């Protein structure tokens, strides 16, 4: 029911593909940019990389389906992994990640983040005591894949989240191989 497009009288909203957004004047662009700053999730676009009305409607639908405050969509799954990690960590911070992880995620966390003085510690997903032992004052995030990319092993998310809450840490879960039910 969220996707109804009463303006165009269609059952589902039309798919809008655009990289360039057209405006009537520079003044109109500036007004849109001011609105976007005040409400970044409000569907105000001045360039295609910010999304279109289609992505905005998708976010609204997913927000309702997932019963969340907001959903942010990215063009790729790995883009969302990158965004989730980079929105949390800063130089000097640490991440604890389940091993094994998706190869590009390993390269990001093990190699790329080093350049920013961000350390990643990998733990055996079947040994949550090791996870707890590796938490330090610098730890900001526990990163989990469920099921695991290479092994398809399932981790005890309930216990991991309890550990995270106890230590006031955020968790990020890559659910690529799962479904909304995992």
Question: Where in the sequence are the language-model features?
Answer:
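Short conserved active-site loop signatures built around small residues
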Residues: 1-16
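Residues at alpha-helix termini
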Residues: 8, 65-66, 116, 167
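Conserved N-terminal alpha-helix of the aminotransferase class I/II PLP-enzyme fold
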Residues: 25-79, 107-111
